Every structure is written in C-alpha cells, then in structure tokens.
Amino acid sequence: KKLTCMAPQHPFKACGESGVEMTEIFPHLSTVADEMCVVRSLKTEAINHDPAHTFLNTGTTISGRPSMGSWLLYGLGAETEELPGFVVLTSVGGGQNQPIASRQWHSGFLPSRFQGVEFHSKGDPVLYVNNAPGVNLERQRDVVDAVQQLNGIRNDVVDDPEIATRIAQYEMAFRMQTSVPSLMDLSDETEETLDMYGTRGSDGSFAANCLLARRLAERGTRFIQLYHRGWDHHGNIKNASAGTAKLVDQGAAALLKDLQQRDMLKDTLVVWACEFGRTPMAQGSGRDHHIKGYSMWMAGGGIKPGMTYGATDELGYNAVENVV
C-alpha cells in the first residue's frame, strides 16, 4: 500500500529568544520555551502502548522491573515523612483514552514501600483519610500502635520486608490524616496563582494535577508523575490534537512559571514525554504509532535551557543526530 506523508496539521513558529520551534496549539507553553531543552531524536523499542509505557518507566519491556520513581525513592529517599515519596496523578480527555496499568509505578523486586501511590485527581485524593465516627485521633493512635506491636512480634520471627513495609504504611496513613487535608487546602494560594493554572483544584483536570504536583514538591515528595490520557489520535488528528493540547497547555506552562517564581525550578527536573511518537505518514485522518523518531522536552534541574538537542531526517521518520 502506498504511504502518503501528512503535512503538519497546525502551524509551527519560533518561540522565545531561543527560537525553539513549537506548534501554535500550545500558546501557553510557547511563553516558557526559553526554559526548555527539547530533545528531537528519541527512539524506543515497543510499538504498542502498554509495553512502550513499561519501557519508558523501567528501561525494559519486561514487566516486573522497578519503575523510575521507585528507583529514585530507593536511592535518594524522600524529604518528607508526612506524605508518600512517590505520587501518581492521572487525567483524561481529548482523544482515544488508552489505559495506564498500575504496574507502571510498581516497585518490582524492590520492597513495596518504594512503589508509587496513586492519588485521586477529583475530590478527596486519598479515600477514608478521616477517622470513623466516634474515633478520635488519640484512639486511632492506640489502634495503630497495637497493630504495629503485633506486626513487630511477627517480624522478629520471620524477618519479612513486607511486614516492615506494612508497618511503615500504617504509620504513613496515620500521618496523612493530617498532612493530606493540609495539602488540599488551597486557601494559601493566591487568586493570581489559581488563575494562572486555570483551576480551583480537585476537579480531575491536568491543570489541577499540576498545581497539586507543585504543592507535593514543596512538601518534599521526591517523584511526582502526571499522566494525561488522550493522545492516541489515529483519526481526526487536526481537531483532536488541538483539543488535547488545550487541556494540558495552561497547566503545564503554569507549573514551570510557578516553580520559577518560587525558586524551585533549579532544583526540580520537569520531564514532558510520551511512550512513542506518531508517523509522518497519514493513517486516514490520523497518524499511527511510531518508534523510530520523536520528541520530548525537559526543564529545570540543571538542564541547559533554550536549546534543541538531536534531530530526525527531513521526513521526521528516523532519528539521525544525537540519537537517544
């Protein structure tokens, strides 16, 4: 079958003083182009979503290996004992919504205390964080202490790391009864900040997750992973990609600006990536999965800003320069 190249469906323009080329469907992100390092020469090994997610998160398509967040938490620890050191938030909208398996933030062969904790992005991020009716904090502390004592007795006999994990999880859950309500109380955010993100929080949007990510980072969470499901544009890519971009553009740009304003960006690495790219050839009115050349961007954390690294060939098919 003859393959026909599909032209860019939205105009590109040079943005910022660096002149980074960005599509016009990201008007907010284009204002922070000078903070980005854009990598245009990625390749991957898996052409379907789930194994490609696994490769991105673990470095292999083999399930059961520790995720990147688990390795970082294992190696570096967290700067807080009041909240999980590895938190995952998901949002959805704009296209075909491919599922994300929870093993993408699993700890693999590392102890399970290093796995990611998924927060709900709408409503209460952690269910049942409040005490049951008739149970005050003092009584709850007594219950946790009694359970921990029993777990400790058993662990002295079998020396099971999963028992130690369970003990740590109970302690974390108890502390989160105070730390999570404080995390979600946005009364300390200015109207200007909320307007910048375009959200009032806890509405399930990517923007709300970006705001929550900044608050988690402020409180010492080591690794925060945001997923937005809605990029699988096998058809109607012109309209669908614009719709998906609109859902993430403002929040992502606000996160970079907010981190910069708070002097946190230099110590916080922001990575915007996907599991693979899309073909330069048409698939009807869309594009198929593509593993031979695609892009990502990073900002902060010591990354050199305002630059483009690597390149594909003239068709955007193969990564040919500084391949990653």
What residue spans do the PLM features occupy?
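Ligand-binding pockets and gating/stacking loops
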Residues: 1-324
